[in-house]
């Protein structure tokens, strides 16, 4: 009589008890999120606003995509959620303002964070200033502050991955220019000047396309970054190289 073969879960699948517990946890998370205010729907995540344990919170949920294998989806979502939580913690340890992480729900790939109440995006602040003052001169102090913050971030070898003025907040009182960095979903750790240069190039492209006629503001930012970072020289050299590659691609089409 042949011995019975032990059955094992298919690659990437959870054993039955674990799968049931995971499904139950996801269901609880789904019920909780359904009672919150949806404030943003992106390609990779939904952002909700609500209360978590009595505190104003923002919840970022990386939802599954139907076109990916479930096991790959679970690994990718978990990895990006962990990366973002670690980046926020790394910022705060370095003295860079970022939301407090309240809780990480690995079952549903949800990140529960502090809501920066009363804040405005740097994008909205710049647009408002340009509308009222009709000149970028009033933004020089803001540019200097952004340069200092991003220099410190890069000196910690943290690459944001999606630097835009929408991913920077100003918390009240606005005139104090207290910048809070958010949305580290594409962040990673790297000491390479190339990666930091690309990070700055992404910001430059987003900045100048979103805020026309602010070239002098971005120049002030780079000057501040240069004087604030201990590693600025090779990074800015790489930024120039990345710009050149970008121009060549534009000419080729």
From Swiss-Prot:
Cited InterPro entries: Bud32, Kinase-like_dom_sf, Prot_kinase_dom, Tyr_kinase_AS
Source organism, top-level taxon: Eukaryota
Tissues expressing this chain: Highly expressed in testis. Weakly expressed in heart kidney and spleen.
Record's subcellular location: Cytoplasm; Nucleus
GO cellular component terms given for this protein: cytoplasm; cytosol; EKC/KEOPS complex; nucleoplasm; nucleus
Alphabetized SUPFAM superfamilies for the sequence: Protein kinase-like (PK-like)
Active-site residue list: 162
Region (Disordered): 1-21
Annotated residues for binding of ATP: 39-47, 60
MF annotations from Gene Ontology: ATP binding; hydrolase activity; p53 binding; protein serine kinase activity; protein serine/threonine kinase activity
EC numbers for this chain: 3.6.-.-, 2.7.11.1
Pfam families, sorted: Kdo
Catalyzed reaction equations: L-seryl-[protein] + ATP = O-phospho-L-seryl-[protein] + ADP + H(+); L-threonyl-[protein] + ATP = O-phospho-L-threonyl-[protein] + ADP + H(+)
Recorded consequence of changing residue 81 to R: In GAMOS4; abolished interaction with TPRKB
Single GO biological process annotation from the record: regulation of signal transduction by p53 class mediator
Domain comment, as recorded: This protein is considered an atypical serine/threonine kinase, because it lacks the conventional structural elements necessary for the substrate recognition as well as a lysine residue that in all other serine/threonine kinases participates in the catalytic event. TP53RK has protein kinase activity in vitro, but in the context of the EKC/KEOPS complex, the catalytic subunit OSGEP switches the activity of TP53RK from kinase into ATPase.
Assembly information from the UniProt record: Component of the EKC/KEOPS complex composed of at least GON7, TP53RK, TPRKB, OSGEP and LAGE3; the whole complex dimerizes.
Entry function: Component of the EKC/KEOPS complex that is required for the formation of a threonylcarbamoyl group on adenosine at position 37 (t(6)A37) in tRNAs that read codons beginning with adenine. The complex is probably involved in the transfer of the threonylcarbamoyl moiety of threonylcarbamoyl-AMP (TC-AMP) to the N6 group of A37. TP53RK has ATPase activity in the context of the EKC/KEOPS complex and likely plays a supporting role to the catalytic subunit OSGEP. Atypical protein kinase that phosphorylates 'Ser-15' of p53/TP53 protein and may therefore participate in its activation.
Family membership: Belongs to the protein kinase superfamily. BUD32 family.
Associated clinical condition: Galloway-Mowat syndrome 4: A form of Galloway-Mowat syndrome, a severe renal-neurological disease characterized by early-onset nephrotic syndrome associated with microcephaly, central nervous system abnormalities, developmental delays, and a propensity for seizures. Brain anomalies include gyration defects ranging from lissencephaly to pachygyria and polymicrogyria, and cerebellar hypoplasia. Most patients show facial dysmorphism characterized by a small, narrow forehead, large/floppy ears, deep-set eyes, hypertelorism and micrognathia.
Protein name: EKC/KEOPS complex subunit TP53RK
């Amino acid at each position: 009589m042949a011995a019975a073969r032990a059955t094992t879960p298919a690659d990437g699948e959870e054993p039955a008890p674990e799968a049931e517990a995971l499904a139950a946890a996801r269901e609880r998370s789904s019920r909780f999120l359904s009672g919150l205010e949806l404030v943003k729907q992106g390609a990779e995540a939904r952002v909700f606003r609500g209360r978590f344990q009595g505190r104003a919170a923002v919840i970022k949920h990386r939802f599954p995509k139907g076109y990916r294998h479930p096991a790959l989806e679970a690994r990718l979502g978990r990895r990006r959620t962990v990366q973002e939580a670690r980046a926020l913690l790394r910022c705060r340890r370095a003295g860079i303002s970022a939301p407090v992480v309240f809780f990480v729900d690995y079952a549903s790939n949800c990140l529960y964070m502090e809501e920066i109440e009363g804040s405005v995006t740097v994008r909205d602040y710049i647009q408002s200033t340009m509308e009222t003052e009709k000149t970028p001169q009033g933004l020089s102090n803001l540019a200097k502050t952004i340069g200092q913050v991003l220099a410190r971030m890069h000196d910690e070898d943290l690459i944001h991955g999606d630097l835009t003025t929408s991913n920077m907040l100003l918390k009240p009182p606005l005139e104090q220019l207290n910048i809070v960095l958010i949305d580290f979903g594409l962040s990673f750790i790297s000491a390479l000047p190339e990666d930091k240069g690309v990070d700055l190039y992404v910001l430059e492209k987003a900045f100048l396309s979103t805020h026309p006629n602010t070239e002098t503001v971005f120049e002030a930012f780079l000057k501040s970054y240069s004087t604030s970072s201990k590693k600025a020289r090779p990074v800015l050299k790489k930024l120039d190289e990345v710009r050149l590659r970008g121009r060549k691609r534009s000419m080729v089409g």
